[in-house]
Curated annotation (Swiss-Prot):
Signal peptide: none annotated. This is Large ribosomal subunit protein uL23. The keyword Ribonucleoprotein applies. Part of the 50S ribosomal subunit. Contacts protein L29, and trigger factor when it is bound to the ribosome. It comes from Arthrobacter sp. (strain FB24). GO terms for biological process: translation. One of the early assembly proteins it binds 23S rRNA. One of the proteins that surrounds the polypeptide exit tunnel on the outside of the ribosome. Forms the main docking site for trigger factor binding to the ribosome. InterPro entries: Nucleotide-bd_a/b_plait_sf, Ribosomal_uL23-like, Ribosomal_uL23/eL15/eS24_sf.
Amino acid sequence: MSAATIKDPRDVVLAPVVSEKSYGLIDEGKYTFLVDPRSNKTEIKLAVEKIFSVKVESINTINRAGKRKRTKFGWGTRKNTKRAIVTLKEGTIDIFGGPLA
């Protein structure tokens, strides 16, 4: 990789996804993140390993099309998003900063 292609990890991994399904996957060692739609699996893997100091086993990505919504001025669309489900080899990530309620 050249210096021009190296991205800041916080520009690749934007936020954890908080949902019922993502909570259920944590027990299996899988963590779900909202990521930059232009990033690929290799960039996501390097970013997660650097931010959380863990080893990544695999990554599954999901491209989600923005919903079509009615506005005051006609029809518009929300922006497209991308999610990454990251499976860890070992270890855990303290995403939410405390015990689950």
